């Protein structure tokens, strides 16, 4: 477990506690006025080492009122699932600058959409979570939507100078400015305990049952997509005609990471996998 995770849990606990007494506007962290480095091009990857260390197969109980249950089409009740963490480092020579989600919504540029259950904005086409049967090629998908792009931890394998401070730590809210992005040499992380960070294995989300066996977790950040129904194309893929990406990058070919896992027949509530000994508490959306 990385040292930053306990710190993140502590900060998250304070935010959850504050939710009981503070108005929604108070959740917007004060924007840190810092210069953004856009003299170059960002390059997102998926942290394969983190993914390899952060997964678990176990049974959990899903409440009908949970937003991930409603948005992901999951039947309330008990389900075996695979949970996992996803880190998306920026190894490019420039920051990824997103800024304030409210401005993107006002511009109708296709980067964000409003999530009625969570009452905040979600990214569109930020990442693709797939569970792959290596024999048949069948693919299951998770319904997780990206929410807030932040500098959460420095990426130790960054090839350039890694002495810069964080810049992006403000998600913002509806009507409250945010300041989002990923600085070069930093990584955003969606921890395994968060809502939607899982595949449902028993068909409880409407997909086919996942039999016990060996599988591949495949994560794609900033995936290519074909615009539908007048959907904006923010960044055209230079090597694939008609394919677009939400964020600019110097290299779209290094956006995928895969790890092999084994799904047992009866994982139980204690679970099977590298995170077996972790607590069972499930956090919020970020």
Model-identified regions with their sequence ranges:
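Bacterial N-terminal signal peptides that target proteins for export
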Residues: 2-12
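Extracellular/luminal regions of secreted and cell-surface proteins that mediate adhesion/ECM remodeling
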Residues: 28-286
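Bacterial N-terminal signal peptides
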Residues: 11-24
């Amino acid at each position: 477990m990385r040292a930053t995770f306990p710190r993140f849990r502590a900060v998250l606990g304070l935010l959850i506690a504050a939710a009981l007494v503070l108005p929604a506007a108070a959740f917007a962290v004060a924007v840190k006025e810092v210069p953004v480095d856009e003299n170059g091009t960002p390059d997102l990857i998926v942290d394969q080492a983190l993914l390899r260390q952060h997964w678990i197969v176990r049974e959990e109980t899903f409440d009908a009122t949970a937003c991930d249950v409603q948005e992901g089409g999951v039947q309330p009740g008990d389900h075996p699932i695979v949970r996992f963490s996803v880190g998306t480092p920026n190894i490019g020579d420039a920051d990824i600058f997103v800024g304030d989600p409210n401005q993107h919504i006002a511009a109708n540029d296709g980067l964000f959409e409003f999530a009625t259950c969570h009452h905040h904005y979600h990214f569109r086409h930020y990442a693709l979570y797939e569970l792959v049967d290596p024999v048949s090629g069948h693919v299951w998908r998770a319904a997780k939507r990206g929410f807030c792009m932040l500098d959460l931890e420095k990426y130790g394998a960054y090839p350039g100078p890694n002495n810069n401070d964080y810049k992006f730590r403000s998600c913002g809210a509806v009507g409250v400015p945010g300041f989002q992005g990923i600085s070069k040499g930093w990584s955003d992380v969606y921890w395994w305990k968060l809502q939607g960070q899982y595949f449902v294995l028993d068909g409880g989300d409407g997909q086919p049952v996942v039999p016990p066996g060996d599988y591949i977790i495949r994560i794609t950040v900033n995936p290519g997509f074909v615009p539908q129904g007048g959907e904006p194309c923010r960044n055209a893929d230079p090597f694939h005609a008609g394919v677009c990406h939400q964020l600019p990058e110097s290299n779209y070919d290094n956006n995928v990471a895969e790890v092999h896992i084994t799904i047992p027949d009866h994982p139980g509530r204690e679970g099977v996998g590298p995170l077996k000994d972790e607590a069972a508490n499930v956090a919020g959306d970020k």
